[in-house]
From Swiss-Prot:
GO cellular component: cytoplasm
CDD domains associated with the record: DHOase_IIa
Gene from which this protein is expressed: pyrC
Cofactor binding notes: Binds 2 Zn(2+) ions per subunit.
PROSITE patterns, per database record: DIHYDROOROTASE_2
Gene Ontology biological process: 'de novo' UMP biosynthetic process; purine nucleobase catabolic process
Function: Catalyzes the reversible cyclization of carbamoyl aspartate to dihydroorotate.
One function term, GO molecular function aspect: zinc ion binding
Cell inner membrane in keyword set: no
Protein's UniProt name: Dihydroorotase
Provenance organism: Caldicellulosiruptor saccharolyticus (strain ATCC 43494 / DSM 8903 / Tp8T 6331)
């Protein structure tokens, strides 16, 4: 048994904040109430005074690198990193080696996760065989085996007819298509956002329309096919406008952006910081503001981390040779609190919706809720704690965080999943 004392419970934007104790028995919340009787001999007692308790988080877009790239990350190390950041459900992308493009590979990911992961790992299947953009993968069989979405993330499905067929199949199998929107005819060879910083650094730029033209295409295809299109890692103001327009049309489109896109700009790459090389690239302050407004209005539905671990040897090279991507599990909540709550006046309940209710709804799961009889999936957060992101404190096998050296506010101190304590008082136990 676990007893959390003096909890300030935040379930969502619309629920009132409740101050109470939480009693956890086995994997469920047994009781929520005032002054629950303590029994130190039979229960673990956690004092949450001055902290908030909220449902644990879900990430619908991450990379665990297994199989094939275990030197960067694997299912066990990635899951531990996710747990450290408060995530107890994560959806891993199929760009592994071999790719997750068939029933057997989906089964493998699920088997490995059951074997080594302390949290829930859900596989995303590929749209096309081998992620080659030439032939549709086994969408129906992968859905049967447990894939929760399909995506060729890391690559764009450039063939519009193939993408249309993928959307048609996804509709028939009731599975969302997660679209990586990048016109490679426009972005090929690009390193950073096309603009002021690309000009002064001499690095080849990626025009913003490389993202928005594919978003426009996919919205029209989703409208025609009446399919669920999910647009991932949105980075430009034009993209936000297009998604807003699509929702006004009644298109079944959802979208996410990432912590680094709502907090940082292209100026992070001044000095050729390869940890700031991500795809899509960091954009301008105008884009940051448009993304924040999109989150506020509900145009962008949720936050994903796009946790993309890379070995130090793939980052400690010339900028144009460096791999694209940043890790994100362990900093996600703190970045959102620092840049959305502290700096832009978001309600903390809105962050719960962006990290729990909305991503789970997109992939067809009910939200984690702190109510009697529900599964005990929760985090305890110190909203006042300030901490610096340091390489030596990162749990992930790779350390390529764009937030290294930055000071963030709020810290996920304790994580409980299905009644098991994965992290307590900042110490990971899984």
């Amino acid at each position: 048994m676990i007893l959390i004392k003096n909890a300030q419970i935040i379930n969502s934007l619309h629920d009132k904040v409740e101050k109470a104790d939480i009693l956890i028995v086995d994997d469920k919340i047994k009781k929520i109430g005032k002054d629950i009787e303590e029994n130190p001999e039979k229960m673990t007692i956690i004092d949450a005074s001055g902290k908030v308790v909220m449902p644990s988080f879900t990430d619908i877009h991450c990379h665990l690198r297994e199989p094939g790239f275990e030197y960067k990350e694997d299912i066990k190390s990635g899951s531990r990193s996710a747990a450290a950041g408060g995530f107890t459900t994560i959806c891993c992308m199929p760009n592994t080696n071999p790719p997750v493009d068939n029933r057997a590979m989906v089964a493998y990911i699920k088997y490995r996760a059951r074997e080594v992961s302390p949290i829930e790992v859900l596989p995303v299947g590929a749209i096309t065989k081998g992620l080659l953009g030439e032939e549709l993968a086994e969408i129906g069989f992968m859905k049967e085996e447990g894939a929760i979405a399909i995506s060729d993330d890391g690559k764009c499905v450039m063939n519009a007819n193939l993408m249309k067929n993928a959307l048609l199949y996804s509709r028939d199998f009731s599975i969302p298509v997660i679209s990586h929107c990048e016109d490679t005819n426009l972005s090929e060879g690009g390193q950073i956002n096309l603009g002021y910083v690309s000009t002064i650094t001499g690095l080849r730029g990626i025009p913003r329309e490389a993202e928005s033209v594919i978003i426009a295409r996919d919205i029209l295809l989703a409208k025609e096919t009446k399919s669920h299109l999910h647009i991932t890692h949105v980075s430009t103001k034009e993209s936000v406008r297009l998604i807003k327009m699509a929702k006004e049309w009644g298109v079944n489109v959802t979208a996410d952006t990432c912590p680094h896109y709502i907090s940082l700009t292209e100026e992070e790459v001044l000095g050729f910081n390869t940890n700031a090389k991500v795809n899509p690239p960091l954009r301008t302050q105008e884009d940051v503001e448009a993304l924040i407004e999109g989150l506020k209005e509900g145009v962008i539905d949720c936050i994903s981390t796009d946790h993309a671990p890379h070995h130090k040897d793939e980052k400690n090279v010339e900028f144009n040779l460096a791999a694209s991507g940043t890790i994100g599990f362990e900093t996600a909540f703190s970045v959102l609190f620092t840049y959305l709550v502290e700096k832009n006046g978001f309600d903390i309940g809105k962050i719960v919706e962006l990290l729990n209710h909305n991503p789970r709804k997109i992939i067809g799961l009910s939200p984690n809720v702190l109510k009697e009889g529900e599964k005990a999936n929760l985090v305890i957060v110190d909203l006042k704690k300030k901490w610096e992101v340091k390489e030596e404190n990162i749990v992930s096998k790779s350390k390529n965080s764009v937030f290294l050296g930055k000071l963030l506010t709020s810290y996920v101190e304790t994580v409980i999943y299905n009644g098991k304590i994965l992290k307590k008082d900042g110490v990971l136990n899984c």
